[in-house]
Amino acid sequence: MMPTKSLPDRTMEALKEAVQYAYECQFDNDHWSGEVHSNPIFTAEYLFLRQALGLDFTQDEKDGFIRWFLLQQNEDGSYGLAPDYPGDPSTTVESYLSLKMLGYPIDKPEMVQARDYMLRTDGMKNVRIFTRFFLATFGLWPWDYIPQLPLELMLMPQRSPVNIYTLSSWARATCIPLLVVRHHQPIYALPNGAHKDNDFLDELWNDPSNKKIPYSQSLWQMVGKEDLTTIAFTAADKVISLLGGFRKFPGRRYLRRTVVDWLVMHQEHSGDWGGYWPPMHGTILALVLEGFPLNHPVIRSGMEAVERYAMHDKNGRRYQATTCALWDTAVMTVALADCGLVRPNNVRLTNTVEWFLKRQCRGTEGDWRVYRPELQPGGWSFQDIDNWYPDVDDTAIVILGLLKHYPTSINSEHIIRGMNWILGMQNPDGGWAAFDWNNDKLFLNKIPFGDMESLCDPTTADVTGRLVECLGHFIRSPHAHTVDADFLRTVETSAQRGIRWLLDNQEPFGAWWGRWGVNYVYGTSNVLSGLHYFMHKGDDELNLAISRAVEWVKSVQLEDGGWGEGLSSYDDPALAGKGSPSTASQTAWSIMSLIPYVPATDPAVTRGVDFLVRFQTLLGSDHAYDRGKTGKNGKSWPEDYYTGTGFPGHLYLQYCLNPHYWPMMALGRYLRKAKGAGLTGHLEDELEGFPEPVV
């Protein structure tokens, strides 16, 4: 009988398979770009755009869309924000409208079930503002019952607490084109024609004769119930409505031209706007309403960019909310470094470095300049190309990847520029947000159009944790002595300010909230991955915070050895770390939370590592590369639950490479820890000579 292999042995085998799979998935031998799964709304709104522009669909396109929409439906007929997530009326009505536009018969069982869900829940009265907005463009909702979006917002000075630059980058890029659309109030044709009072969706209403559904309480109802800010914004909206939305006021033509100029200026050379679907959709509609023909170079390149969001496979045709080439490549680069099986002179790796360097944002673009005009550019973006909106999280993880593979590059121009940029983007409160500086005017979420509560980009624990990790790795680098001493002190001071914010914002139960990943498991992992660089004897406050977080991570481990947290924890903190079966990515995050602080033999770590090793499969995730890049060799991990976050409570994502690079990273860090403890035995030869990642 063959002796049972040790956990380090099995981990090494799993890592080799994972590296092979990663190689198979690489595009052009220099980058990775997995699909971003979300909910059906983005595909639906692509169809709305095509319908509004009068662009026909081929039968093959129709069949592909129909097949995909039907696969997304819940058993009760609804459509949710994520697979197996409770029904959402906005997602359901947009999916139903899409299927009906495509010619799918309304007497089919799937349509009957969706209709029954909407009627049973009185869903039409509860759709979000954006859904109302796009229904109004087809005459399916009265424009009078949509909040105002006055073009005069463009006139507000930058020092005002309410102006386009106090909105978050994504809200700004989305809302500015909608100012023009709201001004024009178009009515586009559906298959039954163009009608101001179109009855195309009347079967979804319990009372189709009354579609005048208020989007807020009356001012009288608000008195004594709502805060003064909400009342003031609502009152302003009512006044603007009474004045006809200012449409006939002097200067409207100038304001429309101002918006058009802003939109054209913000188009990337690739044709994109904002690297995210809503700005693409709204901007094309706005420019066409302002007289741009469909063959205009701006519109043509914009439509070409839209098509790069398309995915088509056996499951049907759909459109992504965004793309994530730079993020995927950066995280994969760190994972390859941490697993210790890729030499720095590997041609794939050197090609990836060149790919990164070409994409550093060093031009004159960038809305971040409005409030940080003296700061030198040097960030990286989330997408392949998004020069207007680099973000500090991506910049930090690119720097980590470069430093882990090439420690001697610490003084290179690209890294120093990147470091200077993220230092300059640190918020006055000591933490970091994703895209903007000091973007914390949370009262803006009280405007009638802010029902998704995502109009700002304040400091968050997960981003701050990543930045502390990046700064800590920079300071503790074996080549840090080659860096200017004053600059190192600046980095140290910045890190300490970030740590102070994290200590002040730890949850009572020991975890940290995750803005961009689900949820407390993600936030806590990012924070603990950074704090260990700054542990030292005598700092009782920091050590206590770490101890509480480590104990919390251990307390939510599942019986199978993994970790799983559901989306519902965003609605109910009592569900933090709970509510989902174990997932590969969340298990990896949790292992990385623990590795710096406990022995490699700690039961929580070994059970977690064992879970990842056991659940690695030949096919990995069903959501892996459907663009002809599914790994034919190597292994990955299955993951059907969404672990990425767009807007908590409103948009959830699954990055199809999440269940690959995070487990690689975790297993690599475990193996290094095991090596340090003398547990790797005969594996020493395989581990010898590789750069030693700091874990």
UniProtKB/Swiss-Prot annotation:
Keywords: Isomerase, Repeat
Cross-referenced InterPro entries: Hopene-cyclase (IPR006400), SQ_cyclase_C (IPR032696), SQ_cyclase_N (IPR032697), Squalene_cyclase (IPR018333), Terpenoid_cyclase/PrenylTrfase (IPR008930)
Gene: polA
Lineage per the UniProt record: Eukaryota, Fungi, Dikarya, Ascomycota, Pezizomycotina
One Gene Ontology molecular-function label: intramolecular transferase activity
Practical applications: Polytolypin and biosynthesis intermediate compounds show antifungal activity and can efficiently inhibit the growth of the pathogenic funfus Candida albicans.
Quaternary structure and partners: Monomer.
Pathway(s): Secondary metabolite biosynthesis; terpenoid biosynthesis
Pfam families tied to this protein: SQHop_cyclase_C, SQHop_cyclase_N
NCBIfam families referenced in this protein's UniProt entry, alphabetically: hopene_cyclase, squalene_cyclas
Protein name, UniProt field: Triterpene cyclase polA
Stretches forming PFTB repeats: 62-103, 256-296, 415-456, 546-593
Record-listed E.C. numbers: 5.4.99.-
Main function: Triterpene cyclase; part of the gene cluster that mediates the biosynthesis of antifungal fernane-type triterpenoid polytolypin. PolA is dedicated to the biosynthesis of the fernane-type skeleton motiol from 2,3-oxidosqualene. Within the pathway, polC then converts the 4-alpha-methyl group of motiol to a carboxyl group, polB is responsible for appending a hydroxyl group at the 2-alpha position and polE is a dual functional P450, which can catalyze the formation of both the 1-beta-hydroxyl group and 10-beta-carboxyl group.
Family: Belongs to the terpene cyclase/mutase family.
Catalytic reaction list: (S)-2,3-epoxysqualene = motiol
